[in-house]
């Protein structure tokens, strides 16, 4: 199975502080997603060396209350290094790793793994960009982004599967 990854953070650079990490297993040529998923709220104190951008804090202030509450809720937060270990176990079991855009989620995760001197749990050639696929179908209906990492993973999976069906894709390499 493939894996869709999404995270929410406090900036756009590779060293940004991570609020939440989500990963959802799925078949890109199927419908819906599998039961295997990962979701974690990350402890901010475990990320003191990571950056925070004021413009992103300001942006979060404009988001719906539900998105802010999920991203900043203090309940059940775990240290970043623990989340990376848990996420890595799921990533290694996946055929391809998808994220929306080539420069945000995976760059931040790569920086995080390297900052803890942890090996990357993926090979460079398995990373895929869902946004590029969406661009092949300009009329693709795009539901709004919730900025809840797991909900966004699932929305991106739905859009990816819909686009691949629309394009009559029968096989992925």
Q: How would you name each of these model-derived features?
A:
Residues 3, 8-99:
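Conserved non-catalytic scaffold segment of RNase H-like nuclease domains
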Residues 6-8, 105, 129, 152:
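Acidic active-site catalytic centers that drive phospho-/nucleotidyl reactions
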Residues 37-42, 121-124, 172-173:
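Short alpha-helical "patches" and their helix-cap loops
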Residues 72-75, 125, 145-148:
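Pocket-edge positions in alpha/beta enzyme catalytic cores
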Residues 88-91, 103-124:
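Substrate-recognition/cap helix-loop segment adjacent to the acidic, metal-dependent catalytic center
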Residues 96-102, 107-108, 112, 138-173:
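Acidic, Mg2+-coordinating catalytic module of metal-dependent nucleases/exonucleases
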Residues 121-142:
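Short, flexible loop segments at boundaries between secondary-structure elements
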């Amino acid at each position: 199975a493939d894996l869709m990854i999404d995270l929410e953070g406090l900036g756009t650079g590779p060293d940004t502080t991570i609020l939440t990490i989500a990963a959802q297993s799925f078949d890109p040529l199927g419908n819906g997603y599998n039961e295997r998923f990962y979701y974690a709220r990350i402890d901010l104190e475990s990320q003191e060396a990571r950056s925070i951008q004021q413009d992103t804090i300001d942006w979060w202030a404009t988001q719906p209350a539900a998105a802010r509450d999920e991203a900043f809720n203090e309940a059940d937060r775990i240290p970043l290094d623990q989340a990376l270990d848990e996420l890595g176990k799921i990533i290694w079991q996946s055929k391809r790793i998808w994220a929306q855009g080539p420069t945000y989620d995976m760059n931040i995760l790569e920086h995080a793994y390297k900052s803890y001197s942890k090996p990357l749990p993926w090979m460079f050639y398995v990373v895929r960009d869902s946004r590029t696929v969406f661009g092949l179908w300009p009329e693709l209906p795009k539901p709004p982004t919730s900025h809840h990492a797991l909900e966004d993973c699932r929305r991106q999976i739905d859009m990816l599967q819909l686009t691949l069906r629309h394009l009559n894709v029968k096989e992925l390499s």
